[in-house]
Amino acid sequence: MLPYQDKVGAFYKDNARANSTKLSLVTEGHGGRRPPYLLFVLLILLVGILALLAITGVRFHQVSTSNMEFSRLLKEDMEKSEAVHHQVIDVLTPLFKIIGDEIGLRLPQKLNEIKQFILQKTNFFNPNREFDFRDLHWCINPPSTVKVNFTNYCESIGIRKAIASAANPILLSALSGGRGDIFPPHRCSGATTSVGKVFPLSVSLSMSLISRTSEVINMLTAISDGVYGKTYLLVPDDIEREFDTREIRVFEIGFIKRWLNDMPLLQTTNYMVLPKNSKAKVCTIAVGELTLASLCVEESTVLLYHDSSGSQDGILVVTLGIFWATPMDHIEEVIPVAHPSMKKIHITNHRGFIKDSIATWMVPALASEKQEEQKGCLESACQRKTYPMCNQASWEPFGGRQLPSYGRLTLPLDASVDLQLNISFTYGPVILNGDGMDYYESPLLNSGWLTIPPKDGTISGLINKAGRGDQFTVLPHVLTFAPRESSGNCYLPIQTSQIRDRDVLIESNIVVLPTQSIRYVIATYDISRSDHAIVYYVYDPIRTISYTHPFRLTTKGRPDFLRIECFVWDDNLWCHQFYRFEADIANSTTSVENLVRIRFSCNR
């Protein structure tokens, strides 16, 4: 039997396996040369891979661009949605509320007013009393049953309407920022700062007179709804010899216009100089409805006679229109009409206002009817003699134990009636300072703010609410208190002490700003600093906050007169100030008039 190796060798001898070695060599020899079609396939495969990579890159770029565009569109849609949300919440919602108020509240009221107007006009055709019409069309063809004083009436009404039409564009620009809030926001997290600046009055008549070395004294200014008025005594220089008398009474009126950088400019449009020997040593002033009105007397205390026992002194009435040479420019002496119990009135520096063609002022008055009531108030309050005023032996301005009441002077300026000065009186908080009462218009109907200035640093001024209608009342509002010992309607002004602050040489009048909520301003001439200064104090009694700002002076002296009048302009406080002082070095008297601006801001 053959061994295993021999069997294998014998098997391969008869088969192709025997030549396997040779075949293997031949196969290796042919594999070193690759066929061309294989290289072509590889090339196509490489090109395909590159094409796929290029397509992938292009698609990736397109997707990135699409995502960016989608993000941009989404952001725009979000901004539009936010704008729509803002319009709905901040604009449409208040607008709908206003529309609801107009439809639900004001529209019925207006319809009722229209109804009353129609009823009133229809009743005119069958009047049962004498009527006074204010419509121009009644001048053309009035009903025969109507009795109207037509002397210069129609002409005056036409002129007034023409003047109002010409003045309205100027007033609208001035009133655009005249009712804003001068104070920083209520929730001010940082400190509140104030910045002040002084401006000259370059086109004011009084400034031109002062610049010519003429002396101006006792200036009284009133500002109302974009119109200002002044009255003062002018003492011409002896060298010029332009006037025949030593003192000339001057009135001027004009607009408050916007000037450079929207600052207010007091531009004189009309003025009047009273002739010599006129009874115009002491004058009041009232401004409103494009008109200035003034009451002038020779002596401050005016006696009132109600029978033939005495000769009643007349009061000089001066009216001045906003433009030159109009029927509003008028001078006339009138006899006041007062209640029989009134004995005297005291006229000094009084500022009033004109509303509904009626000029109104407040003055101290002496009336026998209210004496016992006022004395009873003092006696009950002074039982313990804890108040400084309890030791007073004489009361201003009438002297002795004669306690003054509140007098109201009203002067209708309607062209259809003759000038008549009516005097009424009432009782109110005790008056300690008889020199000066001012009356400011209030946003409340038929009322105003009556102010009495402080005095000697010991008597604080006070602010009362005074009625303007038929029912004349004076109610305490600020800087008064009801003593514990008294009962009923008894109020006293705040009296600090009998020791005067020696650093405060003089105090100004109290000015109530024409804002919705009451704010008031007062100024003092202060010498507590190295430089003399006029310091302004601004108060908000509702929020119980106050601000101060000093204006340093370049001169030093002893002042004898300080008067301010303030208004709001573009949310800033502006004040016209006039002060007169005797210089320490030159030993001469100097008058200064200018505008000051105070801007309050919040440092958050």
Swiss-Prot record:
Q: What topology does it adopt in the membrane?
A: Single-pass type II membrane protein
Where the protein is mainly located, per its record? virion
| Keywords recorded for this protein, A-Z | Glycoprotein, Hemagglutinin, Host cell membrane, Host membrane, Host-virus interaction, Membrane, Signal-anchor, Transmembrane, Transmembrane helix, Viral attachment to host cell, Viral envelope protein, Virion, Virus entry into host cell
Mutation effect (residue 549 to A)? No effect on fusion activity
Signal sequence segment: none
Q: Which Pfam family would be a valid example here?
A: HN
Glycosylated residues in this chain: 149, 422, 587
- Location in or out of the cell: Virion membrane; Host cell membrane
- Effect after changing residue 545 to S: No effect on fusion activity
- Tell me the outcome of changing residue 543 to A: No effect on fusion activity
- Which Gene Ontology terms describe the biological processes this protein takes part in? symbiont entry into host cell; virion attachment to host cell
Q: Give residue spans on the Virion surface membrane side.
A: 59-604
Single GO MF annotation: host cell surface receptor binding
Entry keyword annotation includes Nuclease: no
Effect noted on mutating residue 548 to A = No effect on fusion activity
> Which residue ranges are assigned to the Intravirion compartment in the record's topology?
1-37
Classification via InterPro entries: Hemagglutn/HN (IPR000665), Sialidase_sf (IPR036278)
Changing residue 525 to A has the effect of: Complete loss of fusion activity
Coiled coil ranges (UniProt) are none
Q: How does it assemble?
A: Binds canine SLAMF1 at the cell surface.
What this protein is reported to do is described as: Attaches the virus to cell receptors and thereby initiating infection. Binding of H protein to the receptor induces a conformational change that allows the F protein to trigger virion/cell membranes fusion. The cellular receptor might be SLAM, and may explain the lymphotropism of the virus.
Its family?
Belongs to the paramyxoviruses hemagglutinin-neuraminidase family. Non-sialidase subfamily.
The identity of this protein, by name, is Hemagglutinin glycoprotein
Q: Which organism is it from?
A: Canine distemper virus (strain Onderstepoort) (CDV)
Identify the taxonomic lineage of the organism of origin: Viruses, Riboviria, Orthornavirae, Negarnaviricota, Haploviricotina
**What gene name is listed for this protein?**
H
